[in-house]
C-alpha cells in the first residue's frame, strides 16, 4: 500500500480531499503493522487544515503516537504544529501532547507513570513502548558513563531484571559491579575535530598603513 500512497502524494493530488479516506486507512495500517510514513501522515494533517469538517480525532492521535516512536527526530513537533490549537486542547490529543513533552524533556519516570494511567491510548498501536525504550536508550547512551541498575530499570518503565538484561545486551552495556551498569566511556566517545584555516596574506605587497592601521594611528612613524 505504501507504493500506492506514494503515488497519491505526488503533484496536486497530494491535498485532494477525496484521498483522505485512503490516507486515514493507511495511518491505521502503520499503527497495526509497526510501520511509519511521516510524509503520508503530514499530508493527512494538512488535509484536516484545509477541510476542518473532516477532522478525525482518533486518526490524529495515532499520527502523534507514531511520531513519538521516531524520537529523537522532530516529527512530533512537526505534527503538533499542524494541529489547530483548539484541537490540541481536546482529549486524547492533549494527553498525548503531555506524554510527548515528558519524553522530549527526558522525564522518563513521569512519562511511564502518565502512560500507565492512559494505556487505552495505545489500543491498536503496535510496538509503541519498545520504540520509546529505544529512544530512552539513545539518551542514556549519550549521557551516562555509569548508571545505577535500579535507575535504568525505572527509566525504562519498571522492567524486570531479565527484560533489562535483554536491552543491556542489545546496546552492549554491562554490569561491572553489583548495582552499577557501565554504559560507555564518554571521553573516548568524543572525537574532537582540528580545523586548520590557512590564509595567504602578503603584507609586503600592501602599503604600510593597511597592515596595522590601528597601531600606526596610535604610534605614527
Regions found by a protein language model. Name each.
Residues 1-36, 50-62, 66-221:
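Charged, E/D/K/R/S-rich low-complexity terminal regions of large eukaryotic assembly subunits
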